Amino acid sequence: KVFSKCELAHKLKAQEMDGFGGYSLANWVCMAEYESNFNTRAFNGKNANGSSDYGLFQLNNKWWCKDNKRSSSNACNIMCSKLLDENIDDDISCAKRVVRDPKGMSAWKAWVKHCKDKDLSEYLASCNL
């Protein structure tokens, strides 16, 4: 599934992501835009360390999810394949787990590059939140 920006914003708001970990809803949506282009089936198998990223939030198989390709910390206790389906509830739960670590949203390089310290005040302006 490819979400629209506003569709994802409403879904994340309903899941109490606005303010979660101290990050505004706009930060979460911005991160998803630049990590996956809002696509739940996004997959990146080209990380320098040989790891792969899965789904809407590009969660990594070294730390967050388990696949059959490598050993994993599997901190979200989930199979990576579950992060590629249209149900994003488990992706959201895992993202909440990621942001509880000391790095917070800086775990997502695309967020650091495109969203961190940017003026996101107008980013969701058209979404009728």
From Swiss-Prot:
Residue numbers annotated as active site: 35, 53
SUPFAM superfamilies according to UniProt: Lysozyme-like
Cofactor note: Binds 1 Ca(2+) ion per subunit.
Disulfide links within the chain: 6-127, 30-115, 65-80, 76-94
Domain C-type lysozyme: 1-129
Domain of life where this protein originates: Eukaryota
UniProt name for this protein: Lysozyme C, milk isozyme
Lineage: Eukaryota, Metazoa, Chordata, Craniata, Vertebrata
Protein's gene: LYZ
